[in-house]
UniProtKB/Swiss-Prot annotation:
One of its GO terms (biological process) is L-valine biosynthetic process. InterPro entries: Dihydro-acid_dehy_C, DihydroxyA_deHydtase, DiOHA_6PGluconate_deHydtase_CS, ILV_EDD_C, ILV_EDD_N, IlvD/EDD_N. This is Dihydroxy-acid dehydratase. It comes from Shewanella frigidimarina (strain NCIMB 400). Keywords: 2Fe-2S, Amino-acid biosynthesis, Branched-chain amino acid biosynthesis, Iron, Iron-sulfur, Lyase, Magnesium, Metal-binding.
Length: 619
């Protein structure tokens, strides 16, 4: 039977000093011997998705202590990608994922915690905590802060739904008046919570449900709704159940690596494709799988993407539906239920929401609104928005008159009535991206599924933005933004501003954009990221010249530079001949701190999850 990890610092006379310090934190005599549960919170006043999390750790702690544990909370950093977007701050976003993973590991291992609750929400925080949880492999439950309500405003006598991207597009569109732009800006992000569409934060919080590590509703229940309180309380109770199963009953199925198995990673990717999740999820799932020592690669993602239909279409791919609508339609469990009926997921995998070590099938039987007979579950998924601006969690208790169980015309569809039989994400490959690249097909206009255009090359996001706004980019161009990968950026910036500005200039469906950087979950259009190998690692994207023809064929999963192999060999030889100046941007002024240089030194390309190159660490 496994011994409590915390016994290392709480048992024996030689640990008198450690016990004295534990006592100074509030631990009582009769508490020693209880499991110590770490609560990794990520509260910050910088980020709307985290601004309401200050007291969430106390909620979870109360449930843990009531169930017989010792709860100890600490905090991680959290970067807001939207605020960091479009300037040097974005260089720090992806590297912050590794810092978060490391900080959770440091705190948990330094203090010998027995189990973990991760309170996350936004873009890099959930992935960083997920990497840490799988690295540590102690009982864990994830609970996020939840999505914000969709913005709403009246323009031209019509009520429209809004999100962050709408504010960005309006701000860059000269055809939108200053008054309308300001009105959209004021209305786009009305409450606390992660941005209201199927962007990276909400995508990742949904995927933790599919991985089996969070409770139903984690990805879709609004941050403002009173019902979300129960998710935090139940997370505390559930982690204690998992700890008891492992430490008292030697049940290894309570550990995250046995819950988030290869099958569960497949389930998560199937869900991702079906709901048209952010392309960043590919990066994070591959990274997390490596921490779990699971061989889950781009080849698996490519295989899955060819089999799974698009069952749930949400902003930014449509203005009609936001996360509040996904929740009304049954949330992640509603989508998984349809995927289960289509025979596309494994329902025999463990799940933290299952009682007594049960599986996903039992969870779906209770929480899929098309299966359940429980009126409390229907009530849970009827939780809706209040439309009142606030930074407070649990501030309202509004409900829809009914849930959306229309699988023919609703927010979530059955396989028969899918938005498309092609899924929402695809892996492309060809001489531009020998190791693959990612496109969010859910956001691509049908007329652009095949595209041939002339390369317009930029060696930084800043230059690309200037070129787009300055009129250099014209209809039919393929905008190439390179040296923005994990190593070359460094930090693999998101390219939301270039894609947004293409839309604002009426070029959103008339141009393509490819990059070794990545895209915000708010991106739509023919935007292809994660090109691997990246330019700084000798990728072909570094050899593209202005005017080269690039052919993109999403149905055939192909991206090809129409230049002869002989010419490419000549260009590669010339690049190699530059020595230390080769495979670097020709003209780019960018300050790179020592912290970012340290990240770049070990960073792998996107197809490996942009994680540290372990071969350099393991000799």
């Amino acid at each position: 039977m496994p011994k409590l990890r915390s016994a290392t610092s709480t048992e024996g006379r030689n640990m008198a000093g450690a016990r004295a310090l534990w006592r100074a934190t509030g631990v009582k005599e009769n508490d020693f011997g209880k499991p110590i549960i770490a609560i990794a919170n990520s509260f910050t006043q910088f980020v709307p998705g985290h601004v309401h999390l200050k007291n969430m750790g106390s909620l979870v702690a109360g449930a843990i202590e009531e169930a017989g544990g010792i709860a100890k909370e600490f905090n991680t950093i959290a970067v807001d990608d939207g605020i960091a977007m479009g300037h040097g701050g974005m260089l720090y976003s992806l590297p912050s994922r590794e810092l978060i993973a490391d900080s959770v590991e440091y705190m948990v291992n330094a203090h010998c915690a027995d189990a973990l609750v991760c309170i996350s929400n936004c873009d890099k925080i959930t992935p960083g905590m997920l990497m840490a949880a799988l690295r540590l492999n102690i009982p864990v439950v994830f609970v996020s802060g939840g999505p914000m309500e969709a913005g709403k405003t009246k323009l031209s006598d019509q009520i429209i739904k809004l999100d962050l991207v709408d504010a960005m597009i309006a701000g860059a569109d000269s055809n939108v008046s200053d008054e309308d732009s300001k009105q959209i800006e004021r209305s786009a992000c009305p409450t606390c919570g992660s941005c209201s569409g199927m962007f990276t934060a909400n995508s990742m919080n949904c995927l933790t449900e599919a991985l089996g590590l969070s409770l139903p509703g984690n990805g879709s229940m609004l941050a403002t709704h009173e019902d979300r309180r129960e998710l935090f309380l139940e997370a505390g109770r559930r982690v204690m159940m998992l700890a008891e199963r492992y430490y008292k009953h030697d049940d290894e199925t309570a550990l995250p690596r046995n819950i988030a198995s290869f099958k569960s990673f497949e389930n998560a990717m199937v869900l991702d494709v079906a709901m048209g999740g952010s392309s960043n999820t590919v990066l994070h799932l591959v990274a997390a799988a490596q921490e779990a020592e699971i061989d889950f690669t781009m080849a698996d993602i490519d295989r899955i993407s060819r089999l799974v239909p698009h069952l749930c279409k949400v902003a930014p791919s449509t203005p009609k539906y936001h996360m509040e609508d996904v929740h009304r339609a049954g949330g992640v469990m509603g989508i998984l239920g349809e995927l289960d009926r289509a025979g596309l997921i494994h329902n025999d995998v463990p799940h933290v929401a299952a009682d007594n070590g049960g599986d996903l099938k039992s969870v779906l039987a209770k929480y899929d609104i098309k299966q359940t007979n429980d009126p409390d579950v229907i009530r849970f998924f009827s939780a809706g928005p209040a439309g009142i601006p606030t930074t407070k969690a649990f501030s309202q208790n509004c409900r829809w008159d009914s849930v959306d169980d229309d699988r023919e015309n609703g927010c979530i569809r059955s396989r028969e009535f899918a938005f498309s039989q092609e899924g929402g994400l695809a892996v492309l490959s060809g001489n531009v991206a020998v190791d693959g690249c990612i496109v969010k097909t859910a956001g691509v206009d049908e007329s652009n599924l095949t595209f041939v255009g002339s390369a317009r090359v930029y060696e930084s996001q800043d230059d690309a933005v200037a070129g787009i706004l300055g009129g250099e980019v014209v209809e039919g161009d393929v905008v190439v933004i390179r040296y923005e990968g994990p190593k070359g950026g460094p930090g693999m910036q998101e390219m939301l501003y270039p894609t947004t500005y293409l839309k604002s200039r009426g070029l959103g469906a008339k141009c393509a954009l490819i990059t070794d950087g990545r895209f915000s979950g708010g991106t739509s259009g023919l935007s292809i990221g994660h090109v691997s190998p990246e330019a700084a690692s000798g990728g072909t994207i570094a050899l593209i010249e202005n005017g080269d023809q690039i052919a993109i064929d999403i149905p055939k999963r192909s991206i090809q530079l129409n230049v002869s192999e002989a010419e490419l060999t000549q260009r590669r030889t010339a690049m190699d001949a530059k020595g230390p100046l080769g495979w670097k941007p020709v003209s780019r002024e960018r300050y790179v701190s020592l912290a970012l240089k340290a990240y770049a030194l070990l960073a792998t390309s996107a197809d490996k999850g942009a994680v540290r190159d372990r071969t350099k660490l393991e000799g």
